[in-house]
């Protein structure tokens, strides 16, 4: 796995740091966090690199700007072909599985099913809990996010009630802004001109969360966390990209 770097971004917990310190021994790991981090990095192994940055003045809605800056800071320092971005307050195992997926399908961005929303619930809403792809594509994604945050672009989305168009509202969800920024950068001639679900299937796919056990998923907005027991459909999330087209996207599989 020498051609992939794990980027751990944002606020770092001791639990997350200890987990990856124990499990990531044969490939590069970059921690991109803030100068006020209290973790002791004195015994850092040679495959780990830590970047401590000043906290941006503007957090953005749901800390979108924090995520963008910390991720981009990491991406701009790595040299590997692939990158896997995770949060500093979660952990996932079997990163070899993600690496295998990237080598088989390098053109897509591979995302976790954690709050990857159905189209009826929230258009253009991938998961930002795990984002994996080529370093080139992730740089395109987060540079576009940074540009759009700085310029105020991508702040408007459609709001639906009972599946029907209702009004335009300010986009607060970081995941929507990430998705739309990337698609606008990669496919400007198609974005918002063709069915967004088709475009999402072309550029994204969803990882199998069961293959990432043991894991810890955390939702700060809801003050909830899961250890190996996050069921996507029970949490208004989809497990496969084709569920974007489903009339019953949150039906629990095999039930």
Predicted regions and their residues:
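Catalytic core and acceptor-binding pocket of nucleotide-sugar-dependent glycosyltransferases
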Residues: 95-96, 104, 109-255
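Short aromatic/hydrophobic "clamp" motif used to bind/position activated sugar donors
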Residues: 83
